[in-house]
Protein backbone atom coordinates (compact mmCIF):
# COMPACT_ATOMS: atom_id res chain seq x y z
CA UNK A 1 0.00 0.00 0.00
CA UNK A 2 1.32 3.42 -0.91
CA UNK A 3 0.21 5.75 1.85
CA UNK A 4 0.98 8.92 -0.10
CA UNK A 5 -1.51 7.96 -2.79
CA UNK A 6 -4.32 7.48 -0.32
CA UNK A 7 -3.74 10.53 1.85
CA UNK A 8 -0.89 12.87 2.84
CA UNK A 9 0.19 13.53 6.38
CA UNK A 10 -1.28 17.04 6.21
CA UNK A 11 -4.79 15.79 5.48
CA UNK A 12 -6.05 15.86 9.07
CA UNK A 13 -8.28 18.21 11.12
CA UNK A 14 -5.45 19.76 13.15
CA UNK A 15 -3.29 20.61 10.14
CA UNK A 16 -6.27 21.84 8.13
CA UNK A 17 -7.33 24.14 10.99
CA UNK A 18 -3.73 25.39 11.12
CA UNK A 19 -3.74 26.08 7.37
CA UNK A 20 -7.04 27.92 7.68
CA UNK A 21 -5.80 30.08 10.58
CA UNK A 22 -2.57 30.93 8.75
CA UNK A 23 -4.28 31.85 5.49
CA UNK A 24 -6.99 33.94 7.18
CA UNK A 25 -4.45 35.70 9.43
CA UNK A 26 -2.19 36.49 6.46
CA UNK A 27 -5.10 37.92 4.51
CA UNK A 28 -6.27 40.04 7.45
CA UNK A 29 -2.77 41.39 8.15
CA UNK A 30 -2.28 42.42 4.52
CA UNK A 31 -5.79 43.90 4.28
CA UNK A 32 -5.59 45.95 7.48
CA UNK A 33 -2.05 47.23 6.82
CA UNK A 34 -3.15 48.29 3.32
CA UNK A 35 -6.23 49.98 4.80
CA UNK A 36 -4.10 51.90 7.32
CA UNK A 37 -1.72 53.08 4.59
CA UNK A 38 -4.51 54.12 2.22
CA UNK A 39 -6.92 55.74 4.68
CA UNK A 40 -4.47 56.96 7.32
CA UNK A 41 -6.71 55.56 10.07
CA UNK A 42 -4.68 55.00 13.24
CA UNK A 43 -7.03 53.30 15.68
CA UNK A 44 -5.50 51.60 18.74
CA UNK A 45 -7.70 48.51 18.55
CA UNK A 46 -6.92 48.00 14.85
CA UNK A 47 -3.24 48.18 15.76
CA UNK A 48 -3.77 45.64 18.52
CA UNK A 49 -5.33 43.22 16.02
CA UNK A 50 -2.86 43.79 13.17
CA UNK A 51 0.38 43.70 15.16
CA UNK A 52 -0.46 41.25 17.92
CA UNK A 53 -3.65 39.21 17.46
CA UNK A 54 -3.32 38.34 13.75
CA UNK A 55 0.44 37.52 13.86
CA UNK A 56 -0.25 35.35 16.90
CA UNK A 57 -3.03 33.65 14.95
CA UNK A 58 -0.63 33.10 12.02
CA UNK A 59 2.07 31.59 14.22
CA UNK A 60 -0.45 29.35 15.99
CA UNK A 61 -1.73 28.11 12.64
CA UNK A 62 1.77 27.31 11.40
CA UNK A 63 2.50 25.44 14.63
CA UNK A 64 -0.67 23.35 14.28
CA UNK A 65 0.22 22.23 10.73
CA UNK A 66 3.35 20.16 11.64
CA UNK A 67 1.77 18.98 14.91
CA UNK A 68 -1.11 17.44 12.97
CA UNK A 69 1.25 15.90 10.39
CA UNK A 70 3.48 14.48 13.13
CA UNK A 71 0.50 12.83 14.86
CA UNK A 72 -0.70 11.23 11.60
CA UNK A 73 2.80 10.00 10.73
CA UNK A 74 3.26 8.42 14.16
CA UNK A 75 -0.11 6.76 13.90
CA UNK A 76 0.66 5.31 10.44
CA UNK A 77 4.11 4.18 11.48
CA UNK A 78 2.51 2.25 14.33
CA UNK A 79 0.10 0.60 11.90
CA UNK A 80 2.57 -0.09 9.04
CA UNK A 81 6.11 0.28 10.41
CA UNK A 82 7.76 -1.29 7.34
CA UNK A 83 6.43 1.41 4.99
CA UNK A 84 7.06 4.44 7.22
CA UNK A 85 10.74 5.03 8.06
CA UNK A 86 11.78 6.39 11.47
CA UNK A 87 12.75 9.76 9.96
CA UNK A 88 11.40 11.62 6.92
CA UNK A 89 13.35 11.14 3.67
CA UNK A 90 14.17 14.15 1.52
CA UNK A 91 14.77 12.91 -2.02
CA UNK A 92 14.91 15.72 -4.60
CA UNK A 93 14.75 13.14 -7.38
CA UNK A 94 11.15 12.57 -6.36
CA UNK A 95 9.08 15.30 -8.16
CA UNK A 96 6.46 15.29 -5.40
CA UNK A 97 8.99 15.89 -2.63
CA UNK A 98 10.78 18.49 -4.76
CA UNK A 99 7.55 20.44 -5.20
CA UNK A 100 6.83 20.16 -1.48
CA UNK A 101 10.29 21.50 -0.66
CA UNK A 102 9.90 24.48 -3.03
CA UNK A 103 6.49 25.21 -1.54
CA UNK A 104 7.96 25.00 1.97
CA UNK A 105 10.79 27.44 1.10
CA UNK A 106 8.44 29.96 -0.55
CA UNK A 107 5.94 29.70 2.30
CA UNK A 108 8.76 30.21 4.82
CA UNK A 109 10.01 33.32 3.00
CA UNK A 110 6.49 34.77 2.90
CA UNK A 111 5.98 33.90 6.58
CA UNK A 112 9.27 35.54 7.61
CA UNK A 113 8.45 38.66 5.59
CA UNK A 114 4.98 38.99 7.09
CA UNK A 115 6.15 38.39 10.65
CA UNK A 116 9.13 40.76 10.17
CA UNK A 117 6.95 43.57 8.83
CA UNK A 118 4.38 42.99 11.57
CA UNK A 119 7.15 42.95 14.21
CA UNK A 120 8.65 46.24 13.00
CA UNK A 121 5.28 47.93 12.72
CA UNK A 122 4.26 46.38 16.03
CA UNK A 123 7.35 47.82 17.71
CA UNK A 124 6.55 51.24 16.27
CA UNK A 125 2.95 50.85 17.43
CA UNK A 126 4.00 50.08 21.02
CA UNK A 127 6.16 53.22 20.92
CA UNK A 128 3.27 55.42 19.81
CA UNK A 129 1.13 57.69 21.96
CA UNK A 130 -1.91 55.97 20.46
CA UNK A 131 -0.83 52.70 22.10
CA UNK A 132 0.07 54.34 25.42
CA UNK A 133 -2.83 56.73 25.73
CA UNK A 134 -5.82 55.30 23.88
CA UNK A 135 -5.63 51.50 24.06
CA UNK A 136 -6.48 51.44 27.77
CA UNK A 137 -8.92 54.29 27.28
CA UNK A 138 -10.60 54.50 30.69
CA UNK A 139 -7.40 54.02 32.70
CA UNK A 140 -5.23 56.42 30.72
CA UNK A 141 -7.86 58.98 29.73
CA UNK A 142 -6.83 61.58 32.35
CA UNK A 143 -3.13 61.37 31.50
CA UNK A 144 -3.71 61.28 27.74
CA UNK A 145 -6.11 64.23 27.86
CA UNK A 146 -3.66 66.27 29.92
CA UNK A 147 -0.80 65.37 27.56
CA UNK A 148 -2.76 66.59 24.52
CA UNK A 149 -2.95 70.12 25.94
CA UNK A 150 0.52 70.21 27.49
CA UNK A 151 3.83 71.88 26.52
CA UNK A 152 5.07 68.39 25.52
CA UNK A 153 2.11 67.50 23.29
CA UNK A 154 4.48 66.75 20.39
CA UNK A 155 6.75 64.54 22.47
CA UNK A 156 5.92 60.83 22.47
CA UNK A 157 5.25 59.12 25.79
CA UNK A 158 8.23 56.77 25.40
CA UNK A 159 10.70 59.63 24.99
CA UNK A 160 10.10 60.57 28.63
CA UNK A 161 8.85 57.35 30.22
CA UNK A 162 11.33 54.99 28.53
CA UNK A 163 14.07 57.02 26.87
CA UNK A 164 16.85 55.75 24.60
CA UNK A 165 18.50 52.34 24.82
CA UNK A 166 17.43 48.70 24.86
CA UNK A 167 17.83 48.15 28.62
CA UNK A 168 15.05 50.51 29.66
CA UNK A 169 12.88 49.45 26.73
CA UNK A 170 12.93 45.88 28.04
CA UNK A 171 12.31 47.06 31.61
CA UNK A 172 9.38 49.17 30.47
CA UNK A 173 7.77 46.33 28.52
CA UNK A 174 8.19 43.87 31.39
CA UNK A 175 6.64 46.41 33.75
CA UNK A 176 3.92 46.96 31.16
CA UNK A 177 2.92 43.29 31.32
CA UNK A 178 2.01 43.76 34.98
CA UNK A 179 -0.01 46.84 34.09
CA UNK A 180 -1.81 45.03 31.25
CA UNK A 181 -2.75 42.30 33.72
CA UNK A 182 -4.06 44.95 36.13
CA UNK A 183 -6.24 46.40 33.36
CA UNK A 184 -7.55 42.99 32.29
CA UNK A 185 -8.41 42.03 35.87
CA UNK A 186 -9.57 45.55 36.86
CA UNK A 187 -7.12 45.52 39.76
CA UNK A 188 -5.56 48.92 39.06
CA UNK A 189 -5.79 51.87 41.45
CA UNK A 190 -8.45 54.59 41.26
CA UNK A 191 -6.77 57.00 40.65
CA UNK A 192 -3.41 55.77 39.34
CA UNK A 193 -0.90 56.23 42.15
CA UNK A 194 2.06 58.58 41.69
CA UNK A 195 4.98 59.04 41.67
CA UNK A 196 5.64 56.02 39.47
CA UNK A 197 8.05 53.57 41.07
CA UNK A 198 11.27 52.70 39.24
CA UNK A 199 10.84 55.60 36.81
CA UNK A 200 13.95 56.25 34.75
CA UNK A 201 16.04 59.10 36.24
CA UNK A 202 15.23 62.52 34.80
CA UNK A 203 18.87 63.05 33.85
CA UNK A 204 18.52 60.22 31.32
CA UNK A 205 15.32 61.54 29.75
CA UNK A 206 14.55 65.21 30.47
CA UNK A 207 18.14 66.23 29.85
CA UNK A 208 18.02 64.84 26.33
CA UNK A 209 16.35 68.19 25.52
CA UNK A 210 16.73 70.27 28.70
CA UNK A 211 19.67 70.75 30.99
CA UNK A 212 20.14 73.19 33.89
CA UNK A 213 23.08 75.00 32.29
CA UNK A 214 20.86 75.90 29.33
CA UNK A 215 18.76 78.34 31.40
CA UNK A 216 20.91 81.23 32.53
CA UNK A 217 19.13 84.48 33.29
CA UNK A 218 15.77 85.35 34.78
CA UNK A 219 12.47 85.24 32.94
CA UNK A 220 9.71 87.81 33.18
CA UNK A 221 6.29 86.31 33.83
CA UNK A 222 2.93 88.06 34.05
CA UNK A 223 0.16 86.28 35.96
CA UNK A 224 -3.35 87.36 35.04
CA UNK A 225 -6.17 86.82 37.52
CA UNK A 226 -9.74 88.01 37.87
CA UNK A 227 -11.57 88.68 41.13
CA UNK A 228 -14.64 86.54 41.79
CA UNK A 229 -16.89 89.61 41.93
CA UNK A 230 -19.58 91.15 39.76
CA UNK A 231 -17.11 93.07 37.59
CA UNK A 232 -14.60 90.20 37.33
CA UNK A 233 -12.01 92.81 38.26
CA UNK A 234 -8.65 92.13 36.57
CA UNK A 235 -5.60 91.52 38.72
CA UNK A 236 -2.07 91.38 37.39
CA UNK A 237 1.19 90.22 38.95
CA UNK A 238 4.39 91.01 37.05
CA UNK A 239 7.40 89.04 38.27
CA UNK A 240 10.99 88.27 37.37
CA UNK A 241 11.50 84.54 37.91
CA UNK A 242 15.14 83.89 38.85
CA UNK A 243 15.72 80.63 37.03
CA UNK A 244 19.52 80.69 36.80
CA UNK A 245 22.58 82.82 37.41
CA UNK A 246 24.97 84.76 35.22
CA UNK A 247 26.07 82.99 32.00
CA UNK A 248 29.37 81.10 32.35
CA UNK A 249 29.61 82.19 35.98
CA UNK A 250 31.04 79.69 38.49
CA UNK A 251 28.55 80.91 41.08
CA UNK A 252 25.46 78.70 41.09
CA UNK A 253 22.37 80.69 41.96
CA UNK A 254 18.69 80.96 41.19
CA UNK A 255 16.16 78.15 41.08
CA UNK A 256 18.36 75.81 39.04
CA UNK A 257 21.00 75.96 41.76
CA UNK A 258 19.25 72.88 43.14
CA UNK A 259 20.29 70.80 40.13
CA UNK A 260 23.80 72.20 39.82
CA UNK A 261 24.47 71.20 43.43
CA UNK A 262 24.20 67.71 44.92
CA UNK A 263 21.14 67.88 47.16
CA UNK A 264 19.62 64.80 48.80
CA UNK A 265 16.51 64.58 50.94
CA UNK A 266 14.24 62.22 52.84
CA UNK A 267 10.46 62.29 52.35
CA UNK A 268 8.02 60.90 54.89
CA UNK A 269 5.23 60.30 52.39
CA UNK A 270 4.84 58.77 48.94
CA UNK A 271 3.90 62.08 47.32
CA UNK A 272 7.01 63.78 48.77
CA UNK A 273 5.05 66.58 50.39
CA UNK A 274 6.61 66.16 53.84
CA UNK A 275 10.41 66.56 53.73
CA UNK A 276 11.98 66.61 57.21
CA UNK A 277 15.61 66.19 56.12
CA UNK A 278 17.78 67.88 53.47
CA UNK A 279 21.51 67.41 52.89
CA UNK A 280 23.72 69.59 50.67
CA UNK A 281 27.15 68.50 49.48
CA UNK A 282 29.63 71.39 49.56
CA UNK A 283 32.45 71.94 47.06
CA UNK A 284 34.98 70.64 49.57
CA UNK A 285 33.02 67.39 49.89
CA UNK A 286 31.53 68.11 53.31
CA UNK A 287 27.82 67.53 53.94
CA UNK A 288 25.56 70.16 55.50
CA UNK A 289 22.36 68.71 56.99
CA UNK A 290 19.14 70.66 57.46
CA UNK A 291 16.61 69.20 59.89
CA UNK A 292 12.94 70.09 60.33
CA UNK A 293 12.83 71.74 63.76
CA UNK A 294 9.17 70.86 64.37
CA UNK A 295 9.23 67.18 63.31
CA UNK A 296 12.89 66.13 63.24
CA UNK A 297 14.06 62.64 62.36
CA UNK A 298 16.27 60.68 64.71
CA UNK A 299 19.74 59.61 63.58
CA UNK A 300 18.49 56.04 63.44
CA UNK A 301 15.58 57.07 61.19
CA UNK A 302 17.94 59.01 58.92
CA UNK A 303 20.25 56.01 58.60
CA UNK A 304 17.39 53.67 57.65
CA UNK A 305 15.43 56.05 55.41
CA UNK A 306 15.64 56.15 51.63
CA UNK A 307 17.62 59.19 50.50
CA UNK A 308 16.74 60.62 47.10
CA UNK A 309 19.04 62.87 45.10
CA UNK A 310 17.15 65.91 43.89
CA UNK A 311 16.56 66.16 40.15
CA UNK A 312 14.23 67.92 37.70
CA UNK A 313 11.19 65.85 38.69
CA UNK A 314 11.29 66.94 42.32
CA UNK A 315 9.98 70.35 41.23
CA UNK A 316 8.76 69.67 37.68
CA UNK A 317 6.78 66.61 38.76
CA UNK A 318 3.89 67.42 36.39
CA UNK A 319 5.74 68.66 33.29
CA UNK A 320 3.17 67.21 30.91
CA UNK A 321 0.20 65.71 32.74
CA UNK A 322 -0.97 69.07 34.05
CA UNK A 323 -4.39 69.61 35.57
CA UNK A 324 -5.45 73.19 36.29
CA UNK A 325 -7.82 74.53 38.89
CA UNK A 326 -11.19 75.87 37.68
CA UNK A 327 -10.22 79.35 38.91
CA UNK A 328 -6.98 79.37 36.93
CA UNK A 329 -8.71 77.96 33.86
CA UNK A 330 -11.32 80.71 34.07
CA UNK A 331 -8.58 83.35 34.32
CA UNK A 332 -6.95 82.04 31.14
CA UNK A 333 -10.24 81.86 29.26
CA UNK A 334 -11.24 85.38 30.29
CA UNK A 335 -7.89 87.01 29.48
CA UNK A 336 -7.86 85.29 26.08
CA UNK A 337 -11.35 86.56 25.30
CA UNK A 338 -12.87 83.09 25.03
CA UNK A 339 -15.21 83.92 27.92
CA UNK A 340 -16.77 87.38 28.12
CA UNK A 341 -15.57 89.30 31.20
CA UNK A 342 -18.71 91.42 30.89
CA UNK A 343 -20.86 88.59 32.24
CA UNK A 344 -21.48 89.44 35.92
CA UNK A 345 -19.89 87.00 38.37
CA UNK A 346 -18.96 84.65 35.50
CA UNK A 347 -15.77 83.47 37.18
CA UNK A 348 -17.36 82.95 40.60
CA UNK A 349 -20.41 81.10 39.25
CA UNK A 350 -18.46 78.91 36.81
CA UNK A 351 -15.97 77.86 39.51
CA UNK A 352 -18.81 76.98 41.89
CA UNK A 353 -20.51 74.82 39.25
CA UNK A 354 -17.26 73.09 38.29
CA UNK A 355 -16.36 72.27 41.88
CA UNK A 356 -19.62 70.40 42.52
CA UNK A 357 -19.27 66.58 42.70
CA UNK A 358 -20.63 64.72 39.66
CA UNK A 359 -20.87 61.00 39.00
CA UNK A 360 -20.00 61.26 35.31
CA UNK A 361 -18.81 63.68 32.67
CA UNK A 362 -22.25 63.57 31.07
CA UNK A 363 -23.91 64.60 34.33
CA UNK A 364 -21.45 67.47 34.74
CA UNK A 365 -22.02 68.73 31.20
CA UNK A 366 -25.78 68.60 31.69
CA UNK A 367 -25.46 70.59 34.93
CA UNK A 368 -23.29 73.24 33.26
CA UNK A 369 -25.72 73.55 30.35
CA UNK A 370 -28.61 74.01 32.77
CA UNK A 371 -27.19 76.00 35.69
CA UNK A 372 -25.13 78.68 33.96
CA UNK A 373 -27.94 80.06 31.72
CA UNK A 374 -30.40 79.59 34.58
CA UNK A 375 -28.25 81.76 36.86
CA UNK A 376 -28.34 84.70 34.46
CA UNK A 377 -32.01 84.24 33.61
CA UNK A 378 -32.82 84.40 37.34
CA UNK A 379 -30.39 87.07 38.58
CA UNK A 380 -29.64 89.16 35.48
CA UNK A 381 -32.53 88.71 33.02
CA UNK A 382 -31.45 91.67 30.87
CA UNK A 383 -27.93 90.26 30.54
CA UNK A 384 -29.41 86.87 29.68
CA UNK A 385 -31.21 88.45 26.71
CA UNK A 386 -28.48 90.78 25.47
CA UNK A 387 -25.56 88.38 25.98
CA UNK A 388 -27.24 85.07 25.14
CA UNK A 389 -24.50 84.21 22.61
CA UNK A 390 -21.75 85.01 25.15
CA UNK A 391 -23.47 82.83 27.75
CA UNK A 392 -23.72 79.92 25.30
CA UNK A 393 -20.05 80.35 24.43
CA UNK A 394 -19.17 80.38 28.13
CA UNK A 395 -21.15 77.15 28.60
CA UNK A 396 -19.12 75.46 25.85
CA UNK A 397 -15.79 76.56 27.36
CA UNK A 398 -16.78 75.64 30.93
CA UNK A 399 -17.73 72.15 29.69
CA UNK A 400 -14.32 71.91 28.03
CA UNK A 401 -12.63 72.97 31.28
CA UNK A 402 -14.43 70.15 33.08
CA UNK A 403 -13.50 67.59 30.41
CA UNK A 404 -9.80 68.44 30.70
CA UNK A 405 -9.52 68.52 34.48
CA UNK A 406 -12.15 66.17 35.95
CA UNK A 407 -12.44 62.43 35.29
CA UNK A 408 -15.06 60.84 37.56
CA UNK A 409 -14.53 57.27 36.29
CA UNK A 410 -10.89 57.35 37.41
CA UNK A 411 -11.63 59.52 40.49
CA UNK A 412 -9.28 62.20 39.18
CA UNK A 413 -9.79 65.93 39.64
CA UNK A 414 -7.46 68.87 39.15
CA UNK A 415 -6.30 68.55 42.78
CA UNK A 416 -5.64 64.79 42.83
CA UNK A 417 -1.97 65.07 41.90
CA UNK A 418 0.04 67.80 43.69
CA UNK A 419 2.12 69.99 41.38
CA UNK A 420 5.35 71.00 43.09
CA UNK A 421 6.10 73.96 40.80
CA UNK A 422 5.49 77.10 42.82
CA UNK A 423 3.58 77.07 46.09
CA UNK A 424 0.04 78.22 45.33
CA UNK A 425 -2.14 75.12 45.72
CA UNK A 426 0.44 72.75 47.23
CA UNK A 427 3.44 73.39 49.52
CA UNK A 428 5.82 73.10 46.55
CA UNK A 429 8.90 75.17 47.33
CA UNK A 430 7.84 75.50 50.97
CA UNK A 431 8.42 71.79 51.52
CA UNK A 432 12.01 72.82 52.22
CA UNK A 433 11.94 76.63 52.07
CA UNK A 434 9.71 77.02 55.12
CA UNK A 435 12.18 78.73 57.45
CA UNK A 436 12.01 75.69 59.75
CA UNK A 437 14.83 73.55 58.34
CA UNK A 438 18.00 74.29 60.31
CA UNK A 439 21.55 73.03 60.59
CA UNK A 440 23.22 72.24 63.89
CA UNK A 441 24.86 75.69 63.72
CA UNK A 442 21.54 77.50 63.27
CA UNK A 443 21.67 78.16 59.52
CA UNK A 444 18.19 77.92 57.97
CA UNK A 445 16.78 77.23 54.53
CA UNK A 446 15.39 80.67 53.82
CA UNK A 447 11.76 81.48 53.04
CA UNK A 448 12.70 84.84 51.50
CA UNK A 449 10.43 85.35 48.46
CA UNK A 450 13.08 87.35 46.60
CA UNK A 451 15.42 84.36 46.43
CA UNK A 452 13.39 82.91 43.56
CA UNK A 453 11.32 85.77 42.20
CA UNK A 454 11.26 89.55 42.32
CA UNK A 455 8.18 91.76 42.04
CA UNK A 456 8.23 94.10 39.03
CA UNK A 457 4.69 95.39 39.32
CA UNK A 458 1.18 94.55 40.48
CA UNK A 459 -2.36 95.72 39.68
CA UNK A 460 -5.55 95.07 41.58
CA UNK A 461 -8.67 96.59 43.06
CA UNK A 462 -6.86 97.37 46.34
CA UNK A 463 -3.78 98.94 44.67
CA UNK A 464 -3.99 102.63 43.64
CA UNK A 465 -3.41 103.11 39.92
CA UNK A 466 0.16 104.11 39.16
CA UNK A 467 1.56 102.90 42.49
CA UNK A 468 4.93 101.15 42.21
CA UNK A 469 4.70 97.79 43.98
CA UNK A 470 7.91 96.16 45.18
CA UNK A 471 6.40 93.53 47.47
CA UNK A 472 3.38 91.35 46.84
CA UNK A 473 0.08 92.86 48.00
CA UNK A 474 -2.59 90.29 48.85
CA UNK A 475 -6.05 91.09 47.40
CA UNK A 476 -7.48 90.86 50.92
CA UNK A 477 -5.86 92.14 54.10
CA UNK A 478 -4.69 88.98 55.86
CA UNK A 479 -2.09 90.64 58.08
CA UNK A 480 0.93 88.60 59.14
CA UNK A 481 -0.62 85.43 57.72
CA UNK A 482 0.91 86.46 54.38
CA UNK A 483 4.32 85.56 55.83
CA UNK A 484 3.42 83.02 58.51
CA UNK A 485 1.02 80.78 56.59
CA UNK A 486 1.67 78.90 53.35
CA UNK A 487 -0.42 79.98 50.35
CA UNK A 488 -1.70 76.44 49.87
CA UNK A 489 -3.13 76.30 53.39
CA UNK A 490 -5.90 78.67 52.29
CA UNK A 491 -6.04 78.36 48.51
CA UNK A 492 -6.16 74.58 48.38
CA UNK A 493 -8.76 74.43 51.14
CA UNK A 494 -10.98 76.93 49.32
CA UNK A 495 -10.14 75.59 45.85
CA UNK A 496 -9.76 79.21 44.73
CA UNK A 497 -6.90 81.41 43.62
CA UNK A 498 -8.15 84.72 44.91
CA UNK A 499 -10.08 86.38 47.67
CA UNK A 500 -12.53 89.22 47.35
CA UNK A 501 -15.60 87.43 46.03
CA UNK A 502 -18.76 88.95 47.36
CA UNK A 503 -22.40 89.11 46.47
CA UNK A 504 -24.41 86.69 44.33
CA UNK A 505 -23.04 83.34 43.46
CA UNK A 506 -24.37 79.92 44.35
CA UNK A 507 -25.92 79.14 40.97
From Swiss-Prot:
Keywords: Cell inner membrane, Cell membrane, Electron transport, Heme, Iron, Membrane, Metal-binding, Transmembrane, Transmembrane helix, Transport. GO terms for cellular component: plasma membrane. Gene3D superfamilies: Cytochrome C3, Di-heme elbow motif domain. Disruption phenotype: Disruption of this gene eliminates the ability of G.sulfurreducens to reduce soluble Fe(III) citrate, Fe(III)-EDTA, and insoluble Mn(IV) oxides, electron acceptors with potentials greater than 0.1 V versus the standard hydrogen electrode (SHE), but the imcH mutant retains the ability to reduce Fe(III) oxides with potentials of <-0.1 V versus SHE. The imcH mutant fails to grow on electrodes poised at +0.24 V versus SHE, but switching electrodes to -0.1 V versus SHE triggers exponential growth. Growth with fumarate as the electron acceptor is unaffected in the deletion mutant. Binds 4 heme c groups covalently per subunit. It is found in: Cell inner membrane. InterPro entries: Cytochrome_c-type_ET, Multihaem_cyt_sf, NapC/NirT_cyt_c_N, NapC/NirT_cytc_sf. GO terms for biological process: anaerobic respiration. Induction: Constitutively expressed. The keyword Manganese does not apply. GO terms for molecular function: electron transfer activity; metal ion binding. SUPFAM superfamilies: Multiheme cytochromes (SSF48695). Belongs to the NapC/NirT/NrfH family. This is Cytochrome c-type protein ImcH. It comes from Geobacter sulfurreducens (strain ATCC 51573 / DSM 12127 / PCA).
